[in-house]
Structures are given as C-alpha cells and as structure tokens.
A protein has these predicted regions:
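Active-site core of metal-dependent hydrolases
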Residues: 10-125
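C-terminal amphipathic alpha-helical interaction region
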Residues: 505-703
Length: 703
C-alpha cells in the first residue's frame, strides 16, 4: 500500500523557488534579484555572492555535494559537468564548502567538444555558460547523488550562441518588445512585458528493458530498423485512453512524484493510440521554463523507466506500422498583468485586439511557413510527418468554423456582423445534462491549430527539444507585430487604420487557413495551387535557415547572426548524416551477424526435414516450398546488405555538409529500406525459436 502523498508539500521541494529566495535572502538582495528577473539587467557580483551562498546552503541541506551548469547544446539533449562545493582545506585540515557568485554566474566548458558548425575548433575551444536567472535552479537526484543544477545558456568565446536556450531568450525579448507596442495601441499601459506561454504534450513508448536490450537497433538508434508487423496493431482503437496497466501505472506514479519535486506541473497521463504508447502533459508556463522542464520530463521518463525494468523510447517512429510519437507544442502570448492576447472572448468578431493579433499570426505563419516547418524537422520526424498519423509536411492554420467564418466575412465585406454559435448538445438521456457545445470542432490533422485561446503546433517530434520551434514562432510573430505597430502607431484615424490592416492581412494570407482533412491527397494538390511550400524531409528543410528572408528576420531582431544560422545548418546536415550512418551500419551488423545466420540454421532444419521425410516416403512439398521461399529471400537479403554497405562507404567518404546529407537521404536510406523488406518477410516465415531477437509482438504486447 502506497504512503499518502502531500502533493502541495512535495511540489517544487527540490527547486530553489522565489519563495525559498524570499525566505533565505536579505530583503534588498531579493528585491534586486526579482527586479532583474522582471526587467532584465545584471546582478552585481556582491549580490550574486549572497545568492550563491544561500543556494549552496539550501542544496547542502538537501544532500547535494556538487553543482553543475545545466545547459542545452546543439545535440538536442542536456549537458552537465559536476563540481563539488569543496575548496582547499584550511590550515587545520578542515574542508570548507563554498560556492561563489562568479561560479554561479559563469562556467567554462570546452566548446569544441559540442556541435558548433565550424564556430569552434579544438585550438579555439573556450566556451561560456551563463546563468539564466529566469529559470529556477533545482536539485536532480540520480545514482550519482543529489546535484544542484543551474540552468544556463551556452555561448562561444566570441559570444556566438552554441545552444538552444540563448536564441530562445533572445526571441522572447523580441516578441515582448513588439507585443507591448500592440497592447499599448489598445490602451493597456499597465503591462511591462509579454511572455510566450508553452505547454508541451510528451508522447513516448514503454517496452520491457530486457527485451529491448536484445536488439542492437534499439540500443544504437533508439528505434527498430527491422520488424514485421504484429498480428494486431492499433486497428481496434482499444489502447487510446484505455485502462492503464498496473506496471505502467506504477511507472507513471513515480514519474509524477519526480516531476512534481522538480516543479514540473505534470497534469495529464493516458494511453496513446499505438500499443505501448503513452503521453504525459504539463500545465503551460513561460516558454524558457517550459523548454527546461520538457528536457527534465524526457530525462525523468528514461530514468524512472529503468527502475521499473522498462525502456522509454522517445524516437518519433520506433515501430513501423503503428503511430509514431510527437510533442504538441501549445503556444500562447500573455501580458505580465494577465491578459492572454489569444483569448477571443464571447464575441471574437468584435474583439479588435484579438483580430489584429490573429491577423498578424496568419501573416507570420504564411510568410515563414518554410521556417516553421524547418523548426520541427529532425531525422526521426521524417518517418512520421505526412504518414496518416501526424500532420502533413505542409504548414497550414486550422481556425475552426467560427473564426474561419469571421475571417471570410472580414475579407469579403470588411466587417463581421454575424457569429456562428455552438448550439446545444442534447444527449437524449434524462439523467445527463444538456450543455452548450463549443463553436468549432477539433482537427487532429492540422499542423497549427487554434484551440480556444492558444495555438497547438503539432509537428514537433517527440525526441526533439522544443527550443527551436518556440524560437521560430516567437521570431516570426515578433516581425508581424513590428510591421503592424509601425503602420498603426502614427495613424491619424486608428480605428479605420486597424480595420483596414486586419482586412489586408487576412485577405493576403487567407490561403494559409485550411479546416479540412490534412491527410487527404487532395490537400497536397490544393496546397500546391495555393502556393504553400511542401518540404518533404529534414535535409530539404535545412536550406530555409540561410535564405536572405530568414537571415533578415533573425538578424533584425537580434536572435541569430548569419554566422550562427549557417553554423546551425551545418550541424543539422552533420547530424542527419551521422544518424543515418549509425542506422545503416547497425542494419548491416544485425543482418550479417544475427538474421542471416539464424535463417541459415532454420534452413538447415528444413533441409534435414526434407531428407527425413523423403527417407520415410512422405510428401516433401511443404518443407521444399518453404525452403525455396526462404532461400530466395535470404539471397535477396544478402545482396541488399552488400549494396547498403557499399552505399554507406560512398556516403561516409564524402566531405561533411549538404551534399553528404542528401546522399544519405537519397541513396543510403533507399538501400536501408531495400534491406529491411526481405528481412521482415523472412521473420514471417522463420520458426520463432530461431529468430535472433524479440519481435514487435514481444515488444508491444508484453509490457
């Protein structure tokens, strides 16, 4: 029987919150820290020393002996180096535990050991981590013991961003600056900044760890590279929202406890559509904190899974034939005095501020659909997007019937006098209440959907950091706000000017709205007619980062320099090539050392059976037929393995960069698929006791 939980006491117990600062810091110090958090600026070194001492004392009280600058390099995961609080013993030989303001504010990791796209080399290795004061420090409890983790940004010696956080923070400042101009136009003089709020729904698979460790593909690539479909998949729709199995429920319970300790507002948990697939979702929070917390969610899922004898698979497509995993990025913008700029109110057709914000977002998404698509691209997501399980690779906006009708009225007549209502839902059961329906349905096929008072960006991959998507979203909307504010701030007749601007933006960018079925082939054709970009793969999307349009956008708002953009493009090309190379070599290894030898053993057993049956005077048609089929597929597989290895050698010998990445996409991936086909066919033919590793049925249904 579990002990009773006091969630209120447990929540954020391992976080150095504002409340703990208020208790432990002198009043003047706390006031300075709070002012820097709210208004920006730098802490004095004297103040940083006081904060560092208080933080260290709190951490030691919670069992920590070490601290780390916790940052997010371009690997997409987090990085940390642990330093103890110990200093040189005093003259009496006593150890003194210290932590200075300088150590709190700045660290110096080796920048050349992380992806930099040419910005750093081994002979110019210095990099800096700098404390993000707006994201609270926390204590992470792992097998190494409790460690004080200080969220930081990571940059080069020359100040170039080498991480996911620095551009995000820059984009948040840019968005706030431009959004404040918009709210000032409507008389809001109290707000001092506008924050993007984010809530990321995290999907994942859980499989038995002992079984997963028998498969090299899961170990090395995080997904299955071979595997015939199980007799049952997700076609019965019985896993989604189904009863959570006890083993999985115990895992989820422990995950919640760990996340609540870390201040992560884990709110919702449920089974997802595919067998062995699940989801956890938090409550929204400031974008930079949400990015940090999503990294903690992914780390915690993996760590707790191990304690339960499970393996958490975060790959976007770990199993062929069933749904992959995504990460719905719920995004809204809110003033510091509590006004959500995406709240339409009861009469959105009359809410001019909301309509202007909506028009600006339509303009932003239409103008920079290619960049938004790129922000959600990674190697794993290529297997998921557009696969009748996830949004297509074409960016469009779903507004729902009510708002689409408002937009249509404004475009056609310049005014929106009518508003579609939701009507009553009547169940026909006397004991069930009737209630007013929402004015619009949901569209699960849309990549960018308005869902009441936020936009849900559904393209993001499950394993990816949400830093890049939110950086891009903030940047493109900041640009649209800036252009709108430039037009309206000096207007002689503001009411007429804002009316005309809303109509202009909605007319010019109405093509980005699509409320239909994003999975339909007809949508691809319609999108092409509308002139919307359809970028099919990660490698094809990378170039969008270095177009003149993108460089102008990011440089204008101080989010990226051209050098930073080009370096990121190089990192993405290299990441793609390295990932596919690992997968290709893993496939060859599994084929030559596991599958082919296992099939040959089974073939021998069939041949022995033919001889025995012949000697007994029996009919050998069945074993002969089976042996013939298996031999044919085995020959096909051996040739495909040789061909894949040859393509891999050619690709790996090429200079790193765009051309190599495209070679892996166009040649190596094709060869990988050609090897998988006969292997999966053989799995269906070979006696299970001979097959060298667990099958889809073993992994997905024996958890």
């Amino acid at each position: 029987m579990r002990e009773e939980l006091n969630v209120e006491e447990l929540f954020a117990s391992k976080v150095f919150t504002l409340g703990k600062m208020k208790e432990r810091l002198p009043k003047s110090t706390y006031k300075e820290v709070k002012n820097v958090m709210d208004q920006g600026g730098e802490l004095s070194l004297a103040t940083a020393d006081v904060v560092a001492t208080a933080m260290k004392d709190w951490a030691i009280e919670n069992g920590a002996t070490h601290y780390t600058h916790w940052f997010q390099p371009l690997t997409g995961i987090t990085a940390e180096k642990h330093d103890a609080f110990v200093t040189h013993p005093d003259e009496d030989g006593r150890m003194i535990m210290e932590f200075s303001g300088k150590e709190l504010i700045k660290g110096e990791p080796d920048a050349s050991s992380f992806p930099s796209g040419g910005l750093r080399a081994t002979f110019e290795a210095r990099g800096y981590t700098t404390w993000d004061i707006t994201s609270p420090a926390f204590i992470k409890e792992t097998a190494t013991g409790p460690t004080l983790c200080i969220p930081t940004a990571f940059c080069s010696y020359k100040g170039e961003a080498l991480d996911k956080k620095t551009p995000l923070l820059r984009s948040m400042e840019a968005l706030s600056k431009q959004a404040i101009r918009i709210v000032r136009l409507f008389g809001n003089t109290e707000a001092t900044k506008v924050l993007p709020s984010v809530g990321a729904e995290q999907e994942y698979f859980l499989v038995d760890s002992a079984k997963a460790l028998q498969r090299e593909d899961i170990i090395f690539s995080g997904r299955t590279l071979f595997g015939a479909p199980a007799p049952k998949g997700q076609e019965m729709d019985d896993h989604y929202f189904g009863v959570i199995r006890e083993r999985i429920g115990g895992f989820m319970h422990d995950v919640n406890i760990e996340l609540w300790k870390l201040g992560v507002t884990s709110k919702t948990q449920h089974n997802e559509a595919a067998p062995a697939q699940h989801e956890v979702a938090p409550i929204y929070e400031s974008a930079n904190v949400a990015v940090d917390h999503n990294q903690l969610v992914m780390e915690t899922l993996k760590r707790v899974a191990g304690k339960h004898g499970l393996r958490c698979m975060l790959h976007e497509k770990p199993f062929a034939g069933v749904n992959g995993s995504g990460k719905h990025n719920n995004w809204s913008i809110t003033t510091d005095n509590g006004v959500n700029l995406l709240e339409p109110g009861q009469t959105p057709n009359e809410n001019i501020q909301f309509l202007l914000v909506l028009a600006c977002i339509m303009k932003a998404v239409d103008t920079h659909a290619d960049l938004l698509r790129q922000s959600a691209s990674n190697v794993g997501n290529d297997h998921r997007l557009g696969g009748y399980e996830a949004p297509p690779a074409i960016i469009s906006i779903f507004l729902g019937e009510q708002l689409e009708d408002v937009v249509s009225q404004l475009v056609e007549t310049g005014k929106a006098d009518n508003l579609k209502e939701g009507g009553m839902l009547r169940t026909g059961v006397s004991t069930l209440p009737d209630f007013v329906k929402d004015a619009t349905d949901r569209n699960r096929t849309s990549p960018f959907a308005f869902t009441g008072n936020k936009f849900e960006f559904r393209m993001v991959g499950s394993e990816d950091s949400i830093g890049s998507p939110n950086t891009t979203l903030n940047a493109i909307v900041a640009e649209a706000f800036c252009e709108a504010a430039d037009r309206l701030e000096g207007a002689e007749d503001f009411d007429m000017a804002v009316h005309d601007l809303i109509k202009e933006y909605m007319t010019e960018h109405q093509r980005i709205i699509f409320n239909g079925n994003g999975y339909a082939k007809e949508w691809e054709e319609e999108a092409a007619r509308r002139g919307l970009p359809n970028i099919p793969s990660m490698v094809a999307a990378v170039d969008t980062l270095t177009t003149p349009k993108a460089i102008h956008l990011f440089e204008k708002f101080g989010i990226f320099t051209e050098a930073e953009l080009r370096s990121r493009a190089e990192v993405l090309y290299e990441t793609y090539a390295k990932t596919i190379n690992i997968e290709a070599l893993t496939m060859v290894d599994m084929a030559n050392k596991q599958i082919i030898p296992a099939v040959m053993k089974y073939s021998k057993s069939l041949a022995d059976a033919v001889i025995a049956i012949t000697e007994a005077g029996g009919d050998t048609y069945v074993p002969n037929r089976m042996l013939q089929q298996i031999t044919q597929k085995l020959t096909e597989m051996e040739k495909a393995s040789e061909a894949l290895l040859e393509e891999e050698k050619k690709a790996s010998a090429m200079p790193r960069g765009k051309e190599q990445a495209f070679c892996y996409h166009d040649k190596v991936m094709v060869a990988m698929n050609a090897l998988r086909r006969p292997a999966d066919e053989l799995e269906k033919l070979v006696d299970k006791k001979y097959w060298p590793f667990p099958t889809y049925a073993d992994l997905l249904f024996e958890v």
